[in-house]
Design a protein with these regions (language model features):
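N-terminal Rossmann NAD(P)H-binding glycine-rich loop of SDR-like oxidoreductase domains
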Residues: 3-23
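Rossmann-fold cofactor-recognition segment
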Residues: 43-55
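A hydrophobic alpha-helix adjacent to the NAD(P)-binding/active-site core of NAD(P)-dependent oxidoreductases
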Residues: 48, 90-91, 105, 113
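NAD(P)H-binding glycine-rich loop region in Rossmannoid oxidoreductase-like domains
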Residues: 53-93
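Conserved Rossmann-fold NAD(P)-dependent oxidoreductase catalytic core, especially the SDR/UDP-sugar
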Residues: 73, 99-143
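NAD(P)-dependent short-chain dehydrogenase/reductase
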Residues: 129, 156-211, 216-218, 224, ...
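Active-site helix of classical SDR
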Residues: 143, 147-150
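C-terminal substrate-binding subdomain of Rossmann-fold SDR/epimerase-dehydratase oxidoreductases
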Residues: 200, 204-324
Length: 324
């Protein structure tokens, strides 16, 4: 089965390519910009292509030249921090590109199309204790979540109107390699871990923040399971642990992974709710029922794996001190 992965140099897309390559799956990896030598060398069996997926003619030409069986559509303007300043660009990327790929899938009768979406389509669900099941009605409140919901609706339309095996898998607050960031849109785990490894004491607010954090390897594993399952019986799936983890739990996991880390939190949710509102955890049994997949990393195991990767790549984050 030849798998098309869009957004293949991104956070989740890159991990999907990595895992698919380890399974010896034929992979066509698409990115908006030219792929560097490092990516090409890291994935020697992958066919790398450059394409602006919002360009209908370019997408049709690419898919006509390359036989494709399934697609995991990871390319996106990935959060509100990037979407709000450029709504037209967010619409073109998150909605237009999805429409182009779905039409290509219809014309070529692809076996499977998986759209990666987000828990942000539940922006209006502020009860952090109540799990959000797949059949709950979305409620969007910003540019990013609106464009992703539009993409979901298009995916469902091609499923119901044209018989395409197309489904949406929603993910939430993904963390892990290769992200190195202390920016609020990435959430507390990358920020805490980076500063802890740099021996920077963390004393700040945010203790009341909670989210359904998912380690990147688990997100990619679940998406591959959806792409390769014999049948997807539902239009919507949720991928995650089904619970929210507090910022305090994230801090404890970082302290365990980085002995000696100082993280002391006071009340509030900022800065983590600057671009994303609090919401309940994504939950549901559909993905496990249809694919057999469950996330394999606990919060602590995911943070430890992330810390190990960062220690192995100090050149990416070092600020004059060696991590412990």
């Amino acid at each position: 089965m030849t798998l098309l992965v869009t957004g293949a140099t991104g956070h989740v897309g890159g991990e999907i390519v990595r895992q698919a390559m380890k399974r010896d799956m034929p992979v066509i990896a698409v990115a908006r910009d030219a792929v560097g030598e490092a990516e090409a060398q890291a994935f020697p069996s992958v066919k790398w292509l450059q394409c602006d997926l919002a360009d209908t003619d370019a997408v049709m030409a690419l898919t006509a030249r390359n036989p494709i069986d399934a697609c995991i559509h990871a390319a996106a303007i990935s959060n509100e921090a990037y979407a709000r300043p450029d709504p037209r660009g967010a619409i073109a990327t998150n909605v237009g590109a999805t429409a182009n790929l779905l039409e290509a899938a219809r014309l070529a009768s692809w076996r499977r199309f998986v759209l990666i979406s987000t828990g942000s389509v539940f922006s209006l669900n502020s009860d952090t204790t109540r799990p959000i099941l797949e059949d709950q009605a979305p409620g969007v409140a910003n540019v990013y979540s609106t464009t992703k919901l539009c993409a979901e609706l298009l995916t469902s339309m091609y499923r119901t109107e044209y018989g395409l095996s197309a489904s949406t898998v929603r993910i939430s607050w993904v963390f892990g390699p290769p992200i190195i960031s202390d920016q609020p849109m990435r959430g507390p785990i990358p920020s805490y871990l980076l500063r802890a490894l740099q021996s920077i004491a963390i004393r700040e607010g945010g203790a009341e923040f909670a989210a359904s954090f998912t380690y990147v390897a688990d997100a990619a594993g679940g998406l591959l399971a959806a792409a390769t399952a014999p049948e997807l019986r539902h239009p919507i799936y949720h991928l995650g642990h089904g619970v929210n983890f507090t910022a305090g739990q994230a801090a404890a996991a970082v302290r365990s992974a980085v002995p000696g880390a100082v993280i002391e939190l006071t009340g509030g949710t900022e800065p983590w709710t600057r671009y994303t509102s609090l919401r309940g955890p994504l939950a549901g049994d559909r993905l496990r029922a249809d694919t057999g997949y469950n996330p394999t990393h606990t919060l602590e195991a995911g943070v430890r794996a992330y810390a190990d990767w960062m220690r192995a790549h100090p050149e990416l984050w070092r600020a004059g001190e060696t991590p412990g």
